[in-house]
Amino acid sequence: MTRRCSSFAIILTLTLGAGLALAQQSPAPQTDQPPPGKIIFSRDLNAPVEPQPTNPAAPPQSGSLAVTDAERSAIAFTAYDLDVHLTPASAAISVRASLTLRNDSAAPLTRLILQISSSLHWDAISTRTLPSGPTTPLPFAAHLIDTDADHTGRMTEAVVPLPQPLVPGASVTLTALYSGSIPPSAERLTRIGAPDDQALQSDWDSISPSLTALRGFGNVLWIPASSPPVFLGDGAKLFQSVGLARLRNSAATVRLRLAVEYTGDPPDAAFFCGLRQPLAAISDNANLPEAESPGVATALFDAQPLGFRSPSLFITDRPASQTGTPANPNLIAAVTDHYDALPAYAAAAALVEPLLTDWLGPQPLTSLTILDNPGQPFEDDALLVLPMRAVEPATLAPALAHSLAHAWIHSSRPWIDEGLAQFLSVLWTERTAGRAAALAELQDAARSLALAEPELPDSTLSPAGTSLATATTDVFYRTKAAAVWWMLRSIVGDDALKQALQTYRLDPRLDLDPIGLQRTLENSSHKDLRWFFDDWVYRDRGLPDLSIVSVTPSQLTSRTGLPAGWLVAVEIRNDGFAAAEVPVTVRSTSASETQRLRIPGRSSASTRIVFAGTPAEVQVNDGGVPETQSTTHTRQLLLPSH
């Protein structure tokens, strides 16, 4: 398959998460053998609870099985129940996955499409026709196809015929066995010309004794997916595909039973979908020296909502070091051997903590966990993977304001979760460099947003991925959302927004309500915000397009006939579809007067401002409201002579 890429540097910058891959390991075949006395993980195909077919699957073929992208896009995963067994010494993985799939297409499905990394292979797939009945083995064919959704640049795709068609809206549960190895690989980048070292800075997913890092769809297909092939050189389609998959599967539940083989010191903890569980170690032979003693470490992650993420798994080999501030001494848990970096992170946390406590409340909900790993960063709420180094606290503070926001407030809604964290980063800029610097930051971000927004948005609910409530790309759920938070601050005021945020974060029921945030803000501000949420959150109206139609200054006189200032009438046109509430400012050389004005989409509005001095200029919008073109509009005044 032919693919074109104009610049590897651009692709490397865009790659999903990233970092330096771990040292190359040669995978060797290995049979899973739990320690005697306790079964930690079993793939017994004759097990009475879930009997599986004993005939091994044929190896995947490179030829096409004539699968359509419509078939690949037809299903949503609504439940993952995973038994995962890892052997880090050989990068080996074997999985028993119970998958509940729903037909989200408009037509019945006669077969299902399941995909895993090309370094893995399907062993068996079965289903139950009755809830309490025996499992029925399903025949399937597997082939290899190119895709950059996996770091190897390929995936193993299984085509599974169904005993009977799956009608639209119906669900089916399959049990799939698959295995293989996940060593470091950056094949998708090196085959388009990337130097090995730079490629491995981006694609660092692997299973190894020092760190197991599996970031999921878009990086490594370690659990089954179903999506059309996408490529890094084809615009932003890979990243859009990742976002759509996250949205489609966000309501799923995930459960994991994990077993990790080890020799010597056991691994310390596992992080699944951003949550931590300690690993309980069971030694296979206590009579051997500790450095030679094999064992199995286990962890259980109970069923939980997946949310807007690709399921990820990290396993660390050492306990975290705690650091923080006097008020929150365990604010940061860092798994690192760069202990000299801890004081810098503690000092940076102390710098941004007053901002976070002022806006969100005195105590975080969780610690921020940092896994020290060379390469580009990866973030999943309050889990951060990045290279830790001893640098100036002021250098760390802007990014830490964003990351620590995830420790203070959690939301299942990406535009709240990520947008609010980005908004707090802008507030940090305002607090340290001034309002003009914060507005300049917003204006820079608005340029990329203007390119992404449609010129003629639909007047009804937008398709998933464009309205902020269902956004799937970061230009919306992070960039646009930060601007939305800034505008809400301008509309309701700091105190009302702080009160709403502190109420919202402590009541999970509000996050479950699609309009819970709107109601909370309306209660704290005593303002009707439906117009704003309709145009900026629930629908995608695009961006405003403002212009100054006219400015009419009229001199005022006192009762004695002496000049008493000016009345400046300003008419503003909005040629965009989204309503905007913007500041309208009249200035002289020494003073200014500002009023806020709401201009509905495709409409005009006017205001009159009384100005005590001699007006010289009118400005509409200060850069805080993103627009399709310029985000500030000025007009110099020519005063009438008397």
What name fits each language-model region?
Residues 364, 474-558:
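Amphipathic alpha-helical substructures
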Residues 109-143, 263-265, 587-594:
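Solvent-exposed beta-hairpin/edge-strand motifs
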Residues 123-126, 265-273, 552-621:
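Beta-strand-rich binding/interaction modules
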Residues 418-492, 507-509:
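Acidic/His/Gly-enriched intrinsically disordered linker/tail segments
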Residues 174-311:
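Extended, low-hydrophobicity, Ser/Thr/Pro/Gly-biased non-transmembrane segments
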Residues 24-94, 530:
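N-terminal, polar/Ser/Thr-rich
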Residues 40, 120-203, 243-249, 291-292, ...:
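A surface-exposed beta-strand-loop module
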Residues 297, 318-416, 420, 424, ...:
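Juxtacatalytic substrate-recognition/specificity segment
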